[in-house]
Amino acid sequence: MKKLKLHGFNNLTKSLSFCIYDICYAKTTEERDGYIAYIDELYNANRLTEILSETCSIIGANILNIARQDYEPQGASVTILVSEEPVDPKLIDKTEHPGPLPETVVAHLDKSHICVHTYPESHPEGGLCTFRADIEVSTCGVISPLKALNYLIHQLESDIVTIDYRVRGFTRDINGMKHFIDHEINSIQNFMSDDMKALYDMVDVNVYQENIFHTKMLLKEFDLKHYMFHTKPEDLTDSERQEITAALWKEMREIYYGRNMPAV
């Protein structure tokens, strides 16, 4: 896309929001309570603040304010308001490609915010536990928050990811013509690294004329031991392993497709 010469400030709002899910099977009530306590502590407000603050540091944003809160019985939220340092729009890369990983990211946010909320929960009887982190990065100006996508997903490893990206508003060039998007994008997947894309099955649902993009990701490899909390698969009978595997896979597909499915 040809670089635009703007009249005044870039007034486009670019919002990236995504949910990440971690799935676990806890055999007993004690194990379920233990998983919820473990994941709640792992992603408490202080830890989330560190992740988001590091994100701001890596992308070159100034932190204006931090609001954080842990909740009872579980859950946490953090919101960070940021502003950008002076940046020459001519230096901004607007091509479609994966954002760099944490050690190499350099970018700027403008009049923006980054927020995260966590939602641990468990099935009352079935032994299934899920942890959801809801993250939003919203920017005004020349930078797309998609550049932070690689870093954040790598920081929060997950079984399922749903991502939404939208560009709202318009900005004018020096001739007064409106522009409703200022960078190339055909798919959110084009902003992910090859190693990440190799790990997940993905599907896109995009509304190009509305500048709305949606990608769903489901982890390809399924290893039961990674989903058990304090119980080893080898300590279970074959029928128990099959039953738990079926329950976990059903849970993951329901979350991925966003609908309840009949038992097989």
UniProtKB/Swiss-Prot annotation:
It catalyses: S-adenosyl-L-methionine + H(+) = S-adenosyl 3-(methylsulfanyl)propylamine + CO2. GO terms for biological process: spermidine biosynthetic process. The modification Pyruvic acid (Ser) is found at S112. Its cofactor is pyruvate. Binds 1 pyruvoyl group covalently per subunit. The keyword S-adenosyl-L-methionine applies. Pfam families: AdoMet_dc. SUPFAM superfamilies: S-adenosylmethionine decarboxylase. Transmembrane segments: none annotated. Pathway: Amine and polyamine biosynthesis; S-adenosylmethioninamine biosynthesis; S-adenosylmethioninamine from S-adenosyl-L-methionine: step 1/1. GO terms for molecular function: adenosylmethionine decarboxylase activity. Its EC number is 4.1.1.50. Is synthesized initially as an inactive proenzyme. Formation of the active enzyme involves a self-maturation process in which the active site pyruvoyl group is generated from an internal serine residue via an autocatalytic post-translational modification. Two non-identical subunits are generated from the proenzyme in this reaction, and the pyruvate is formed at the N-terminus of the alpha chain, which is derived from the carboxyl end of the proenzyme. It comes from the Bacteria. InterPro entries: AdoMetDC_fam_prok, S-AdoMet_deCO2ase_bac, S-AdoMet_deCO2ase_core. One of its GO terms (cellular component) is cytosol. It is an enzyme of class 4 (lyase). Heterooctamer of four alpha and four beta chains arranged as a tetramer of alpha/beta heterodimers. Catalyzes the decarboxylation of S-adenosylmethionine to S-adenosylmethioninamine (dcAdoMet), the propylamine donor required for the synthesis of the polyamines spermine and spermidine from the diamine putrescine. Belongs to the prokaryotic AdoMetDC family. Type 2 subfamily. This is S-adenosylmethionine decarboxylase proenzyme. It comes from Escherichia coli O127:H6 (strain E2348/69 / EPEC). The gene is speD.
